[in-house]
């Protein structure tokens, strides 16, 4: 299994629609202002956060149960920024829609710009033949409110191509998050 380069990422995005919309270079400014970078990097793709957020709330004093998740545990926000309360959590989604090839697995890591501020981005791997918008998980590990910027970079996707095609892909087994649109809550 080998990590794929910027040339491969550009070719796959342009020829197969692996990433849409796609930025072939690295964007570091918008309207003359510095931003958290996004787009193609040497061996990965820096994804952007859309303007749809779900922020945890404790209004109902609900127990968080991944097998029986209460949607009322979140407050929905549509904004160019998201303020995550201290020691709290938010969900978002990517601007980019992904179509992962059958012989590829991705790993997604948070950007150091956020990590150095105590904001951890968690995303599980994109499995072979998974497609959809990526649901992003942001944890604010600090005792202070933390800000996330929509339309800017938040994590980097690394692409690994296998030496052998898998027998059963995510699509083959009817993965529960296949084709997701919007911020998707836990499913069992």
Swiss-Prot record:
The keyword Secreted does not apply. GO terms for molecular function: dCTP deaminase activity; nucleotide binding. CDD domains: trimeric_dUTPase. Pfam families: DCD (PF22769). It comes from the Bacteria. Pathway: Pyrimidine metabolism; dUMP biosynthesis; dUMP from dCTP (dUTP route): step 1/2. It catalyses: dCTP + H2O + H(+) = dUTP + NH4(+). Keywords: Hydrolase, Nucleotide metabolism, Nucleotide-binding. The active site is at 137 (proton donor/acceptor). DCTP binds at residues 111-116, 135-137, 156, 170, 180. InterPro entries: dCTP_deaminase, dUTPase-like_sf, dUTPase_trimeric. Its EC number is 3.5.4.13. One of its GO terms (biological process) is dUMP biosynthetic process. Catalyzes the deamination of dCTP to dUTP. Homotrimer. Belongs to the dCTP deaminase family. This is dCTP deaminase. It comes from Janthinobacterium sp. (strain Marseille). The gene is dcd.
């Amino acid at each position: 299994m080998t990590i794929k380069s910027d040339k491969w990422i550009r070719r796959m995005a342009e020829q197969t629609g692996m990433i849409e919309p796609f930025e072939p270079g690295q964007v570091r400014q918008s309207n003359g202002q510095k931003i958290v970078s996004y787009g193609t990097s040497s061996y990965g793709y820096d994804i952007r956060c859309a303007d749809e957020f779900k922020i945890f709330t404790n209004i109902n004093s609900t127990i968080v149960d991944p097998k029986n998740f209460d949607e009322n545990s979140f407050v929905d926000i549509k904004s160019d920024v998201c303020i995550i309360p201290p020691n709290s959590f938010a969900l978002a989604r990517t601007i980019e829609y992904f179509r992962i090839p059958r012989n590829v697995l991705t790993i997604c890591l948070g950007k150091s710009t956020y990590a150095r501020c105590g904001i951890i981005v968690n995303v599980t791997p994109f499995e072979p033949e998974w497609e959809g918008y990526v649901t992003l998980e942001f944890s604010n590990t600090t005792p202070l409110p933390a800000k996330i910027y929509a339309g800017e970079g938040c994590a980097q996707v690394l692409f690994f191509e296998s030496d052998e095609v898998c027998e059963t892909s995510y699509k083959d087994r009817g993965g529960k998050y296949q084709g997701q649109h919007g911020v998707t809550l836990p499913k069992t």
